[in-house]
Amino acid sequence: MARITPLDRYRNVGIMAHIDAGKTTTTERILLYTGRTHKIGEVHDGGATMDWMEQEQKRGITITSAATTCFWKGMDKQFEDHRINIIDTPGHVDFTIEVERSLKVLDGACAVFCAVGGVEPQSETVWRQANKYNVPRIGFVNKMDRAGADFLRICEQIKTRLGGNPVPMQIAIGAEENFEGVIDLISMRAIFWNEADQGATYETRDIPAELQELAEKKREFMIESAAEANDELMEKYLEEGELSHDEIKEGIRSQTIKSEIIPMFCGSAFKNKGVQVVLDAMIMYMPSPLDVDAIAGILNDKDEAVASRNVGDDEPFAALAFKIATDPFVGNLTFFRVYSGVLKAGDFVYNSSQGKKERIGRMVQMHANEREEIKEVRAGDIAAAIGLKDVTTGDTLCDLKQKIVLEKMEFPEPVIALAVEPKTKEDQEKMGIALGKLAAEDPSFRVSTDEESGQTIIAGMGELHLDIIVDRMVREFDVECNVGAPQVSYREAITTMVEHQYKFAKQSGGRGQYGHVYLRIEPQEPGAGYEFVDEIKGGVIPKEYVPAVNKGIQEQIKNGVLAGFPIVDIKVTVYDGSYHDVDSNEIAFKIAASKCLSEGVRMANPQLLEPMMAVEVSTPENYMGDVIGDINRRRGIVSAMEDTPTGKQIKAEVPLIEMFGYANDLRSMTQGRASYSMEFKKYTAAPKNVADEVIEKLNK
C-alpha cells in the first residue's frame, strides 16, 4: 500500500499548557473545524472528546495524553490536505510525566496561555521540558473574552519569565466582552468570525483606524524577525524595507523550526474565534518529520556505537513506544511513534531495549478513545499496537536485522507514598493485577511491598496523582481498598569519607563461604547519584567477583541505615580485599560488600534528606500577609513576589511534609480566592528535630 499523505505534509504537534488555560477546549475546536467531531464537547459539562477517562470528565482536567489524527486544508482551502497528529497533554503538575513522554515524540508544540493568568507555574515546567527536547513552538493566547485579557502583556511575560522570543503574528481587536476578532499582520486585514455557525466561516475587513498605528509597529517587528532567518532576506529587507507575504512566511517558518522565535496568535476557543488561524500556523510554521534531525540511537550489540535513522519509508523500521494504556475493550495499547521504515500488521519487530522479539497483531489509529483499525504504519505516524506483552514506556521497536536502541526517556522519582490495603480477600488478587497494569502505564508511579509490615506501598508525584490511581482501581478494576495517610519519600546521604573493611567467613568443615572487601565510601554532589569504582590490583579479588561486590552495594543502598530510605549521591570504591580458592563465591562477596557498606555508612555521619517543593501561590493582595505567615510556619522560604492582574504571586520552597492539607488551609485562609501549584524541586538535609522525629517514628 503506497503512502497516502507525503511526509512533508505531516505535522506531529502537542498541545501544551498550564491547567485551565483552555487547552482541551482548543483541541476540541480543532477537531470540530477539521471535521473529526460534529458536536462541540465542552470541558465544563464533562463532554470533551479528548478527556475520555471518567476521572477527567469528573474533575475537568486532562490526565492522560490522548492522541488523535485529523486533516486540514487551510481556512481558505489554500493548502494540500495536511495530516496533523495531535497529542493533548495534561496541565496539572502531578502529570508532567505525560507531557515529557509526549514532547519526546513530537516535532512541534502549540503552547496555550490564558489571556488573563498568562505564564503560570506549570507553563514554566512545560516550557523547560520543551527546551530539553528542543521542540519548536507556536503560542496561542486563549480566553481573550475574559475580564483582564491582554494579548501583548502575555507576549511580554513569555519573554521575561520563560526567556522565549515571542513574535506577535496578530493583534487583538478589542478584549474581554468586546473581543471581536484579530488583525492578521501579514495581510494587514481584520478577521471577524461568524458566531451564527460556531465560527466555521469568517469575513475580512479593513483594519479599524484606532489600531492602524499599533498594527504597523508590530508588523515591522514581525518582518525584522523573519528577515533574520537568512542573509538574502535580511539584505532585501535592508534595501527595500519590506518583504513579500511568502518571504515573511518562509522566514518565520525557518526561525520557528530553529527555535529562535515563537510566533504568537490569540483568540477565544470557547467563543470559536481564532482556532483556524492556529491550524494554518501549524501547517505554515511547524516542522514536518523531514525538517527534524535524524533520530539518534546506539547499536546495542556494538558497544554503544552511535547510530541514527533518517526519516523515510525506505529506511529500516524504528519506532519509540511512548505510552502504555489499558483499554477496557481491547486490553493493552502501546502508543508508538514511527521514525523510519514501514510496519505492517502481522510483522515481527525486535524490542531492542528488552532484547525480545514481538509480533505486531492489530494496530489502531486513535481518535481520543475511539479506535480505527489500520493495516500499516509509515515513518512519521503515531499509532497504537494492541496486546504487546513485554513493551514498556521508552522501549525501542525496530527491524529484526537492523537493530538500534533509540534514546531512553528519563522519568522522575516519586516523592509521596501511601499504603493501600484491599478490603476483602477477593480484592487482594484484583488489586495486584490492577496495580501492575497501572504501573506499566505510568513510569512515575511505583508499587512496592513493605518488607516488615507486608503492606502494599504506592508512590507517585503528588496527592492528586495517587488519588487518581486509587480512583482508577475502583472504577476500572472494581477493587475496593483502604488508603493510609500519605508518607513522604525521604532519602539518606553521607557527609564524610570513610574507609572500612568487612570479612564474611563461614568455614566449618566442608565447603564454606569467604568474601573480604575494603571499601572507600564518599559523599557526592547532590543529584550525582551512585558511582562504583573498581581499584582492585594484583587480583586480590578475582575479576569475576567484582560485579557481585557492586551488586551487594546496590542492594544495600536501597535500604539506608537511619530509617530504611534509599541512600543517594554516594561513591563507593573497592580497593582491596582477599579471597579463598575454594570457599569464595559470588554470594559471599555480595554479602561482604553489603555488610561493609552498611557498617561504613553508619560511620560516615549519615543524614536524612527531605523533598522540598517549589510552591507558587496566587492570592488577592489583602491576604498576602496571612499567606506568607502560613508559609513561614510551614518551614518555607519565600524566594520571590510578583504583581499579577489579580493580586500577588508568591514563590517559595516548602518541605513536602508541611504541605499536606494545604489546599483546604489556603481555601479557608483566603475565602477560596487564592490558588496554588507545587512541584518537586530538590532534596535537602532535614533539620535535626525533624529528622529525629521521622527516624524515631519509623524505627518503633
From Swiss-Prot:
<keyword id="KW-0547">Nucleotide-binding</keyword>
<dbReference type="Pfam" id="PF00009">
    <property type="entry name" value="GTP_EFTU"/>
</dbReference>
<comment type="function">
    <text>Catalyzes the GTP-dependent ribosomal translocation step during translation elongation. During this step, the ribosome changes from the pre-translocational (PRE) to the post-translocational (POST) state as the newly formed A-site-bound peptidyl-tRNA and P-site-bound deacylated tRNA move to the P and E sites, respectively. Catalyzes the coordinated movement of the two tRNA molecules, the mRNA and conformational changes in the ribosome.</text>
</comment>
<dbReference type="Pfam" id="PF03144">
    <property type="entry name" value="GTP_EFTU_D2"/>
</dbReference>
<dbReference type="InterPro" id="IPR004540">
    <property type="entry name" value="Transl_elong_EFG/EF2"/>
</dbReference>
<dbReference type="InterPro" id="IPR000640">
    <property type="entry name" value="EFG_V-like"/>
</dbReference>
<dbReference type="InterPro" id="IPR000795">
    <property type="entry name" value="T_Tr_GTP-bd_dom"/>
</dbReference>
<feature type="binding site">
    <location>
        <begin position="88"/>
        <end position="92"/>
    </location>
    <ligand>
        <name>GTP</name>
    </ligand>
</feature>
<dbReference type="Pfam" id="PF14492">
    <property type="entry name" value="EFG_III"/>
</dbReference>
<keyword id="KW-0342">GTP-binding</keyword>
<keyword id="KW-0648">Protein biosynthesis</keyword>
<dbReference type="GO" id="GO:0003746">
    <property type="term" value="F:translation elongation factor activity"/>
</dbReference>
<keyword id="KW-0963">Cytoplasm</keyword>
<feature type="binding site">
    <location>
        <begin position="17"/>
        <end position="24"/>
    </location>
    <ligand>
        <name>GTP</name>
    </ligand>
</feature>
<protein>
    <recommendedName>
        <fullName>Elongation factor G</fullName>
    </recommendedName>
</protein>
<dbReference type="InterPro" id="IPR004161">
    <property type="entry name" value="EFTu-like_2"/>
</dbReference>
<dbReference type="GO" id="GO:0097216">
    <property type="term" value="F:guanosine tetraphosphate binding"/>
</dbReference>
<dbReference type="GO" id="GO:0003924">
    <property type="term" value="F:GTPase activity"/>
</dbReference>
<dbReference type="InterPro" id="IPR041095">
    <property type="entry name" value="EFG_II"/>
</dbReference>
<dbReference type="GO" id="GO:0005525">
    <property type="term" value="F:GTP binding"/>
</dbReference>
<dbReference type="InterPro" id="IPR035649">
    <property type="entry name" value="EFG_V"/>
</dbReference>
<dbReference type="InterPro" id="IPR005225">
    <property type="entry name" value="Small_GTP-bd"/>
</dbReference>
<dbReference type="InterPro" id="IPR035647">
    <property type="entry name" value="EFG_III/V"/>
</dbReference>
<dbReference type="InterPro" id="IPR031157">
    <property type="entry name" value="G_TR_CS"/>
</dbReference>
<comment type="similarity">
    <text>Belongs to the TRAFAC class translation factor GTPase superfamily. Classic translation factor GTPase family. EF-G/EF-2 subfamily.</text>
</comment>
<dbReference type="InterPro" id="IPR009000">
    <property type="entry name" value="Transl_B-barrel_sf"/>
</dbReference>
<dbReference type="InterPro" id="IPR027417">
    <property type="entry name" value="P-loop_NTPase"/>
</dbReference>
<dbReference type="InterPro" id="IPR047872">
    <property type="entry name" value="EFG_IV"/>
</dbReference>
<feature type="binding site">
    <location>
        <begin position="142"/>
        <end position="145"/>
    </location>
    <ligand>
        <name>GTP</name>
    </ligand>
</feature>
<feature type="domain" description="tr-type G">
    <location>
        <begin position="8"/>
        <end position="290"/>
    </location>
</feature>
<dbReference type="InterPro" id="IPR009022">
    <property type="entry name" value="EFG_III"/>
</dbReference>
<dbReference type="Pfam" id="PF03764">
    <property type="entry name" value="EFG_IV"/>
</dbReference>
<dbReference type="GO" id="GO:0005737">
    <property type="term" value="C:cytoplasm"/>
</dbReference>
<dbReference type="GO" id="GO:0032790">
    <property type="term" value="P:ribosome disassembly"/>
</dbReference>
<dbReference type="Pfam" id="PF00679">
    <property type="entry name" value="EFG_C"/>
</dbReference>
<dbReference type="InterPro" id="IPR014721">
    <property type="entry name" value="Ribsml_uS5_D2-typ_fold_subgr"/>
</dbReference>
<dbReference type="InterPro" id="IPR020568">
    <property type="entry name" value="Ribosomal_Su5_D2-typ_SF"/>
</dbReference>
<dbReference type="InterPro" id="IPR005517">
    <property type="entry name" value="Transl_elong_EFG/EF2_IV"/>
</dbReference>
<keyword id="KW-0251">Elongation factor</keyword>
